[in-house]
Amino acid sequence: NGGAHIDIGNSVGLVNGAPSETLETARFRGDREDLSGSLGFSQILGRDTVFSADFNYLHSTGFLENPHKLVLMGFANPATPPVFDYLFTTLFAMPENRPDTHNQSTLNTHLTQYFAAPDAALHLDYSYSRDDWGIKSQTVEVDWVQALDDGWTVTPRFRYYTQNEADFYQPYFIFREAYPQSPGNPGQLDYSQLPVDAWSSDQRLSGFGARSVGLIISRKFENNLKLEIGFEDY
């Protein structure tokens, strides 16, 4: 493991960077190496306004699969006679196979605006991420932190997230062809001749959107104690 951290600041702004590298061995299957770096800054825009942004990059190589995920593949052979207009389909359940490299870039922005009259602060967050697997995602978060008497605060919040699916994601794979068989071993699937190079049915790689609304009620006490109660509808 290795890493470094750099801070360059002045009275109204701050720039920071943090490259790092980790190496880990995935149990049973192979090695994975992650190389990451980040660069960010914060800027005071006014007496009651602060803006910050950071850019993060992650490069991963090696074993990137989830060893607990299986993928269902079906081969509908058009050469076989159909039964009730359906082709005979041979099914296989196999471990997922992801590309050996993954490059991901993420941009995060945050704006805090304080309002004196209601004694409240508005927090706006926006994040955009994309990678070379075809996934693009966006996140929007809005928090209104309202101060009350006796150290109480009430925070209504909203979050929205959306992403599209990876290039090699499908809930299942169906091919209109006979399944490739290993030479000299009839009946055994030849993985090297599959019609796709990578495949996964991991729902985290699927396209989806989600929104949540919530409320947090908190109170600060002496000795840095804090009580917090909240709920969220997802």
Regions found by a protein language model. Give the residues of each.
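Outer membrane beta-barrel transmembrane domains
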Residues: D54-T112, R130-T139, G151-Y234
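A broad, low-specificity signal marking well-ordered, structured residues that form hydrophobic/aromatic
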Residues: F51, L122, L227
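Residues on the lipid-exposed face of transmembrane beta-strands in outer-membrane beta-barrel proteins
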Residues: G37-Q43, T109-Q113, Y126, V142-Q146, ...
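Short helix/strand-bridging catalytic loops that position acidic/His residues to coordinate divalent metals
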Residues: T22-E24, T139-D143
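Transmembrane beta-strand segments that form the barrel wall of outer-membrane beta-barrel proteins
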Residues: N1-H5, A120-R130, F231-Y234
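Solenoidal tandem-repeat scaffolds enriched in leucines and small polar residues
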Residues: A4-P78, M94-E96
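Outer-membrane beta-barrel channels and translocator barrels
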Residues: I44-D48, A116-P118, D149-G151, E222-N224
